[in-house]
């Protein structure tokens, strides 16, 4: 099965290079891209990005930059220098911060997708209320996603439950990256707003993020292939 633009992103939630690369060597770059988050990047540094790219995988650098505009702009530029496929910032950092990130990429012929994080999938309405945010998670996602589009982001990270409304209000070209995806053979773990791969694609998600159902599987490649099969069912409309 050869997918030139894989919609599946596997989260590499490891703390050592050895354990990470052991898993990566079992995966297929025609079926997925790979996400490097804070734990792995802090433990291993930029070299882990290069090692994974050498193995043929596109990299989503998931560091969720959130700082003053100048600092975020420099961080995004550094990510572009690494040649990553996707990088993200927190929409709650504001329009000026996101615009600075966009401007930092102007000199690059091949730019990473610049994505904004809205509301983390682990957050419930009650969690937001505890932070002083009185609207629901879905309403907060709508607010932040609209701000992200205004600030020229390529898309947002959001729960699959919000995708239909976001696509309707922000347009089909605005990318939706959805964590909280659990294949039919896996449990819910610690994320509260979840969907299966088939459900998420039918809702309009552009890229799906999956972690433990693959990384902790007895046979990671088989798990990856099972998820790819679920995704194929969505494209067939069955």
From Swiss-Prot:
> Known Pfam families for this protein?
OMPdecase
GO CC annotation terms, alphabetical: cytosol
Q: Which domain of life is it from?
A: Bacteria
Which UniProt keyword terms apply here? Decarboxylase, Lyase, Pyrimidine biosynthesis
Catalytic activity reported = orotidine 5'-phosphate + H(+) = UMP + CO2
Q: Known InterPro entries for this protein?
A: Aldolase_TIM, OMPdecase, OMPdecase_AS, OMPdecase_bac, OMPdeCOase_dom, RibuloseP-bd_barrel
Q: Which enzyme class, named as a word? A: lyase
Q: Which GO terms describe its molecular function?
A: orotidine-5'-phosphate decarboxylase activity
Reply yes or no: does the keyword Ion transport apply: no
- Its EC number is 4.1.1.23
Q: Where on this chain does substrate bind?
A: 13, 35, 62-71, 121, 182, 191, 211-212
Quaternary structure annotation from Swiss-Prot or TrEMBL: Homodimer.
Q: What does this protein do?
A: Catalyzes the decarboxylation of orotidine 5'-monophosphate (OMP) to uridine 5'-monophosphate (UMP).
Q: Which family does it belong to?
A: Belongs to the OMP decarboxylase family. Type 1 subfamily.
What is the name of the protein in this document? Orotidine 5'-phosphate decarboxylase
List the source organism.
Saccharophagus degradans (strain 2-40 / ATCC 43961 / DSM 17024)
Its taxonomic path starts at: Bacteria, Pseudomonadati, Pseudomonadota, Gammaproteobacteria, Cellvibrionales
